[in-house]
Design a protein with these regions (language model features):
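Sequence-structural signature of mature extracellular/luminal beta-sheet repeat domains
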Residues: 1-320
Length: 320
């Protein structure tokens, strides 16, 4: 079956720089989810892990005992999550839009939107969320990376339900963090190898640029650090193709998948201070846990999620 036609946009990516010393990313144990693909993992206010799975289930796992409960069935594909103080969860569902899961397991659609990716909520009830692309689906995400469509958005849902686009033209908008004082947000641009800082007043600046890979979901840990999942390292062939005439990417896109650029099997997470200083750069090559799409930290415990794995991984490194 022929692949969808891409509309390549030229972009000159920054030359990959050496990020300096890295530490080994070591998985000490796994927490079974009872399903596949815990794409985003977060801690609720009681310290339990919450994850969304392929097939629509949102599950809660006690990281000490492994005890598991199903919070809700969305009927779609849950991606980014945000735990609410009352025990409910905001869910970015690829198929259903931005959802609210109540403590009773009820599911309510708040915004009918395609490919919502991550979400945070302010103390006044304002909800901020990203949409990754208006051109492609989750199953076709590589098309957006190849095309560089720049159709990602940061959006805002006001307490009265009004929805507005705050930023557009983003390079596959993804992870989202709200600063502790709620003065600004951090937005990951997966296909732009960077994280932007945005003030609701309208100012936007680069928080972290020229990352060694594709940043995915993010989490503000109890340690005050911004934890970032790097879903895959940058690909040298793709970086060479992006600034060249688009027909070259068209040619490569239509080649057999076996000869196209592929993600290297490297698991990676990074952690930054709120002023953008890199504190942790954890990597492992060819490890037992791959395609890391999310990371969360609470009281020194660091967990990972993945679009393809069946379990939530618990790191053995001490980050307290």
């Amino acid at each position: 079956m022929a692949r969808r036609l891409i509309r390549p946009r030229r972009w000159d990516p920054p030359r990959l720089a050496d990020s300096g010393a890295t530490a080994e990313l070591s998985v000490s144990r796994r927490l079974p989810t009872g399903g596949v693909g815990p794409e985003d993992v977060v801690f609720d206010h009681a310290g339990r892990v919450v994850a969304g799975l392929a097939g629509g289930r949102v599950v809660r796992i006690d990281p000490a005992s492994g005890e598991r409960a199903v919070l809700a069935e969305t009927g779609g594909r849950p991606l980014g999550l945000h735990p609410r103080a009352d025990g409910g969860v905001l869910v970015c569902d690829h198929d259903k839009g931005l959802l609210e899961v109540g403590v009773d397991g009820s599911v309510t659609r708040l915004v009918d939107v395609a490919f919502p990716s991550n979400v945070v909520e302010a103390s006044d009830g304002t909800i901020w969320f990203t949409t990754s692309t208006t051109r492609w689906t989750l199953d076709e995400y590589l098309g957006d990376v190849f095309e560089h469509s720049c159709t990602g958005r940061l959006m805002r849902r006001a307490p009265d339900g009004t929805v507005t686009t705050v930023l557009d033209g983003l390079k596959f908008a993804n992870g989202l963090v709200l600063a502790p004082d709620e003065s600004h947000l951090l937005v990951a641009e997966t296909a732009g190898y960077r994280i932007q800082r945005h003030w609701p007043s309208g100012r936007t600046e680069v928080f972290a640029d020229n990352l060694p890979g594709f940043p995915d979901n993010m989490w503000l840990g109890s340690d005050g650090l911004v934890w970032v999942a790097i879903v895959a390292p940058r690909n040298a062939l793709l970086d060479r193709l992006l600034p060249l005439p688009g027909f070259l990417r068209l040619l490569v896109w239509n080649l057999p998948q076996a000869v196209q650029p592929k993600a290297a099997p490297i698991a990676s997470v990074m952690a930054f201070t709120l002023d953008g200083r890199l504190v942790h750069d954890l990597r492992t090559a060819g490890g037992s846990y791959g395609f890391v799409t999310s990371v969360a930290e609470r009281d020194g415990l660091v967990v990972l999620g993945s679009l393809t794995e069946s379990d939530v991984a618990v790191l053995g490194n001490s980050h307290a």
